[in-house]
A protein has these predicted regions:
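Residues at the starts of beta-strands that form the adenosine-phosphate
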Residues: 4, 28-29, 111-112
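Conserved Rossmann-fold NAD(P)-dependent oxidoreductase catalytic core, especially the SDR/UDP-sugar
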Residues: 96-119
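N-terminal Rossmann-fold cofactor-binding loop
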Residues: 32-36, 54
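A hydrophobic alpha-helix adjacent to the NAD(P)-binding/active-site core of NAD(P)-dependent oxidoreductases
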Residues: 49, 90-91, 105
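SDR active-site strand-loop-helix element
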Residues: 8, 32, 71-75, 113-119
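NAD(P)H-binding glycine-rich loop region in Rossmannoid oxidoreductase-like domains
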Residues: 54-92
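Rossmann-fold cofactor-recognition segment
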Residues: 44-56
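N-terminal Rossmann NAD(P)H-binding glycine-rich loop of SDR-like oxidoreductase domains
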Residues: 5-25
Length: 119
């Protein structure tokens, strides 16, 4: 049985390439993104895609709750993509969202957690 890795922020450039590489080297990968659809990109590459908001704790039930080897967290709100200056939105997504991802990882019993950010 292959080890499972959940990649948050998989619809971003770094997250996407990371998910593809992990699949290529033999991991089972679950790609998580905020976009409602990945237009079949991940499915075409043998990767499950789950759309969710990392701020909504109820959506974490879409993810496996055990037997997750690793979590890689790239999800973030980029200031350059925001319409105007909204520090509350930035803090909620990047701080509280990360706390939710960490909480999920602890509850799922992951062995490895990686957090990377270009923000």
């Amino acid at each position: 049985m292959n080890k499972t890795v959940v990649v948050f922020g998989a619809t971003g450039k770094v997250g996407c390439y990371s998910a593809l590489h992990l699949k290529e080297v033999g991991f089972d990968v679950i790609a998580v993104g905020h976009r409602p659809s990945d237009n079949g990109f991940f499915a075409d590459n043998g990767i499950e895609y789950i759309s969710m908001d990392i701020l909504d704790q109820d959506t974490y039930n879409k993810l496996p709750q055990s037997e997750v080897y690793g979590v890689i967290h790239f999800a973030a709100t980029l200031p350059a993509t925001m319409d105007g200056y909204h520090p509350k939105v930035f803090v909620e997504s990047n701080i509280y969202g990360t706390m939710n991802v960490l909480d999920y990882a602890v509850k799922a019993g992951v062995e490895r957690f990686t957090y990377a950010s270009t923000v």
